[in-house]
Amino acid sequence: MPKYRSSTTTQGPNMSGARALWRATGMSSDDFNKPIIAVVNSFTEFVPGHIHLRELGQLVSQYIISSGGVSKEFNTIAIDDGIAMGHSGMLYSLPSRDLIADSVEFMINAHCVDAMVCISNCDKITPGMLMAALRLNIPCVFVSGGPMESGKIVISDKEIKLNLVDAITCGVNPDSSDDMINEIEKSACPTCGSCSGMFTANSMNCLMEAIGLSLPGNGTILATHIDRKKLFVQAGKLIVKITQEYYKNNNEKFLPRNVATKEAFCNAMALDIAMGGSTNTVLHLLAAAREGCVDFTMLDVDLLSRKIPNLCKLSPNTTFYHIEDFHRAGGVFGVLDELNKVNLLYKQTFNILGLNLEEMLSKYSILTGNDKNIIKMFYAAPSGQKTIKPFSQSCRWNSLDIDRKLGCIRDYNSAFSLDGGIAVLYGNLAKDGCIVKTAGVHEKNLIFRGKAVVYESQDEAVHAILNNKIVKGNVIIIRYEGPKGGPGMQEMLYPTSYLKSMKLDQDCALITDGRFSGGTSGLSIGHISPEAANQGIIALVRTGDFIDINIPNRKIHLDITDNELLLRIKNEKDRGIDAYTPSHRKRIVTSALKLYSKFVTSADKGAVRNIR
C-alpha cells in the first residue's frame, strides 16, 4: 500500500522544520495525517478564459477540506493566444505549454504533493497540465473554466452570432466602417470564458471528457452558467475520494496513466475529428501521449481520420453554431453516442467516475438518458448579458436539439463527410506528415493546384496579403515558423483571417511549418514535418513552383523533378552554417526561446523536447 507522498515532509523528527513551515501556512497537527492536494490554478487577469478562476480555486479548496483533505493552491502562467497573436508574442505561446508542465512538476515534486485538481481553460494551459498529470501520474481531476457565450449583434433586424475571428476579419476588411469595427469589437467577446467557437481551448476541454480525466460537461457548460458550479464542487469532493482509493486501498485504477490509455487517446482523437475541432489538438495529444508513455502517433491520427465521419460544423466552420449550441445538442456525449452506434469507439475505456464509455453514454446521452437531473444540464443556455462573473446566470433553453439529420450534431448517415474533419497529408513536401482541418475546407478546394508564393515569416506574408500581392490560385508558403525555426511554431490566424477579409479564402491555399489557430478556416495546411529548420523540403520551395494538394488521396506534392530537388538540396547545404535558416529575416530571439529551439522536435512528434 503506497504511503502519502506528503509524509516525506510531514512525518518523523527530521521533518520538524518542514512541519514548522507547513504550520505557518495554516496547517494543524491533524492535517499532517491527511492527503495534501494541490489546486493547480491558472487564474490571470490577462485572459478572459481565466479572469474568473480566482474564486473557483477557493471553491474547489473548500470542498477538498470538507471532504477530508488539505488543500494548497498555486498558479501557473497562462498566455492569451488572441492577444499574443500577430506579433512576436506568439513565439512564446507553444513553449509556454512545456513551461506549464514543468512548473507543475516542480511544485508537486518539490512539496511532495499527493494529488491535484487542475483548473485550466485556454489553449496551452489544458495540454500543459495534461502533460504534467501524465508525467507525475498521481490522482488528478481536471475542471476547466468553461466557454464564453457567443457574441451577438443585430444587422438589418437579424441577430448574428460573433466571435474573436469576426473582430479580426472585420478590422482589416476595406469595406468595414469605423462604426462597424467598433460595434463588432465590443460585441464579439461578451463574457468570461474560452472563445465561443470550436477553437483550441474548447476542443481540448471537450477532449478531456473523452480521455476520461474530467467530468461530463467540462467542455461545454458555459462559464457564466450556474450549472458549471457543480463541476467545481464535484471536483473537490471527487479528488479526495480517488486519492483515498489509491493511498488507502491501493487502487491504481484512477491514476492518470490508467485512465488515459491508448484507447482513450484514440477515442479523444475520434471525437476531435468528428466535431471538426482544432488541429492543435493533434500536436497536444501527441505530446501528452509521450509524457504518459502511450504509443499514440501520427499514424494513429491518419488511420482515424480515414474512418471517422465529420458530424459537426461549429464556428469557425460555420456562423450558425457555437459551443452553446453544441451543448444544447448533447455536447461531447452527443457526438460519442453517434460514433458508438457505428462501432467507431473503444467502449471499455473508463473515466474518473469509474464508469466505462457505454455506462456514460447510457446516462449522459440526451437521446436515451432518463435521469432528469442529468438531462437538465443540457438545457443550460446563454443569457446574452456581458459579464466576467462565473455562475452568474441560470437561463435555460426551451428545448434540446435532438435533430440528428440537420441539427448541430449529425448521425452517421447524415454526416457532413464520412472521412472526418481533420486529415493527415503526406508527400515530398511533408515526408513525416502535415495536418489540414477538412471541416473548414470548401468542397471545390479538396483537390487544389496552385503557384507558390514564398515567405519566411508570418509578418512578411501578412504584409503581402494586406497590400494585394496575393491573387487567386496562389499557394502561400510561410516557412521557418516551425517549433525550431520560429522558434515557437506561431499560429497563423491573422494570415487566414486576412485572406478571408480580402475574399481570397476560397481561392488560395496556405501551407506552413507553423500551426493554425482553432479559429482558422479555409485550405490551411500546417505542421509540415520535417520543418524548414530541420532540413524539410519546404525550405527548398521557390516562388513560382506548383504545389498539388489532394485531400481525398491524402497527398501534398511539390511539383519539381527529382534532379531539380537534389540540386536544390545541394545548393542549400552549400550555404554552410546558414543552411536551412531564413535568408533575410530579422527577428530578436531571446535566450529562453533559443534554449527551447535547441531541444524541440518537429510537429509530427508533438513539438516536445528531445532530451532523452
UniProtKB/Swiss-Prot annotation:
InterPro entries: Dihydro-acid_dehy_C (IPR042096), DihydroxyA_deHydtase (IPR004404), DiOHA_6PGluconate_deHydtase_CS (IPR020558), ILV_EDD_C (IPR056740), ILV_EDD_N (IPR000581), IlvD/EDD_N (IPR037237). Disulfide bonds: none annotated. [2Fe-2S] cluster binds at residues 122, 195. GO terms for cellular component: cytosol. The modification N6-carboxylysine is found at residue 124. It comes from the Bacteria. Keywords: 2Fe-2S, Amino-acid biosynthesis, Branched-chain amino acid biosynthesis, Iron, Iron-sulfur, Lyase, Magnesium, Metal-binding. The active site is at 517 (proton acceptor). One of its GO terms (molecular function) is 2 iron, 2 sulfur cluster binding. Its cofactor is [2Fe-2S] cluster; Mg(2+). It catalyses: (2R)-2,3-dihydroxy-3-methylbutanoate = 3-methyl-2-oxobutanoate + H2O; (2R,3R)-2,3-dihydroxy-3-methylpentanoate = (S)-3-methyl-2-oxopentanoate + H2O. Mg(2+) binds at residues 81, 123-124, 491. Pathway: Amino-acid biosynthesis; L-isoleucine biosynthesis; L-isoleucine from 2-oxobutanoate: step 3/4; Amino-acid biosynthesis; L-valine biosynthesis; L-valine from pyruvate: step 3/4. It is an enzyme of class 4 (lyase). Its EC number is 4.2.1.9. One of its GO terms (biological process) is L-valine biosynthetic process. Binds 1 [2Fe-2S] cluster per subunit. This cluster acts as a Lewis acid cofactor. Functions in the biosynthesis of branched-chain amino acids. Catalyzes the dehydration of (2R,3R)-2,3-dihydroxy-3-methylpentanoate (2,3-dihydroxy-3-methylvalerate) into 2-oxo-3-methylpentanoate (2-oxo-3-methylvalerate) and of (2R)-2,3-dihydroxy-3-methylbutanoate (2,3-dihydroxyisovalerate) into 2-oxo-3-methylbutanoate (2-oxoisovalerate), the penultimate precursor to L-isoleucine and L-valine, respectively. Belongs to the IlvD/Edd family. NCBIfam families: ilvD, PRK12448.1. Homodimer. This is Dihydroxy-acid dehydratase. It comes from Buchnera aphidicola subsp. Baizongia pistaciae (strain Bp).
